[in-house]
């Protein structure tokens, strides 16, 4: 197989660009580096396209290796024919290779194998070929009686030959492929309760069936979980008669004395040898499909969360609510440095509201706090009410917001947190994490395992290795899209930079602590274990503010400094201008970019990126994200009425809709049918985590604490 041609065809890309991308990947370059700094070679592929190519490349290479292995295994048995080898080599899917190998795979002794060893294969061939015979089928079988092997009567000999026919039919690759497609396209999934009287979350599935090809992914995952917990019984229902007839249609003229035997063998081959595995396979494919989509949804949600806009200039008082142990307080300056910490008790059992307000007033005045953050966990609603009252009574210029606590406890108790703040209590670390999530969500959330951030569906039921790999790619892509200040970034953040391993990230921090702040990107070459390849892949994503060269604070790669300097000269601008906000009118000064690219012997795509960066050096793409929604007064679910218009923040996106925080401590659901005034294939096509949206209350169930919202006015 020509891998380059195959990839180009499948992904609708130019072969030359595919070949260049594959070469760059094989040379050890990272996806973010190739996407950002090798656009001429790849034709401008973004990180999504490159990851798809890399994934498919791995699959096709594994496929080719498996083909070679299978060919060798069959050849070792002396059963490889030119036709079979050609079929294997032309296969484009691993499943097809395994289907072709199945008849030759070593397996435990089967009824058919036992019959073959007894010399009944010629009789089986007579059945398949519908050979003419004198007398009955039993008369023909009498010649193959083998008492020593246990086939001591014509009936047993004929049954043994039928077993060979059944296995031959069931293992034929074309039959398997055809019946697999038939099962996928026509079968139903049928679900029933193991105990219909028991109350469980799975009651909607107690008597449920739906075609395999139509069942939504979230239902598949719910049914899988219910089955795993022993609450549901699940089977795949296939029209066995139709499947058997379809199998038999390959031999349309079954006549003569062997016809009834052949018919029975085909039916047996399907029911006993094909149906169980095809039904298991159909369930497995359904689960893989659902899990793959769930991982993709999780990845999109995580990307939205990590790409949230930082709240710069915020001096934050963070409250991690609780009851018996009180609310933990952490006050941080604009850089996230801890200024104060303590505990207040606004909730039961102490319910010291007056004392809490006094302490808040003291800290706000002492530390110049302008923003309060409240975690959304236990006791959040009561804590928010006290904060709202405090602002109304004593600090009308103050603002507050609710922050998602998911993963904060995981971080605060982690080894990383104890290394960062060895002298602080776990509870203080947790409160600090909440405040820093507002100041710089990306820098704080990279310290937490992505699976713990809580923006997916059924994440604990998913393939954890695949989930971890996919989410790791998301974090890597966002970190490199934003860029990292090498003098302030934690080792956790640096570890996601292109070309930087976790151990090298720690070395960067150690070098910084020992030698002082980096003032030149070239100093990175002195960091232990940061070799030439790592420097090439990392340099453009590591920023140095206030260094010797203003270009070090931009996304311009050091390999392009000469071009960038020439561009500035053409524009009549000194490099020092970059430190004062860049050159907004640089495009007007330069004229034709394509002509300039030719003059400077630089690729047009690369030059466009350089010019855009010089226009606004160090621009943070997160500044395009929606602003954080702040409040000054608290709402509760009792305040909501149908028709009420609200502004909210998307907290989670799932297959069936989006959950929106409207400030009442219970996220409302916008069903997929109410996201837009048009057909929506998936909610992620309309919204993503972190979006600020306008919604209308449709229905409020106060007893069950459920809120139904719509994004379509008047719906």
Ranges and model annotations:
Residues 281-299, 452-483, 597-642:
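Long, charged amphipathic helices and adjacent flexible linkers at domain junctions
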Residues 181-189, 319-323, 377-379, 403-410, ...:
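A glycine-rich phosphate-binding loop feature that marks nucleotide/adenosyl-phosphate handling sites
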Residues 96, 100, 401, 407, ...:
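Long, charge-rich intrinsically disordered scaffolds of nucleic-acid metabolism proteins
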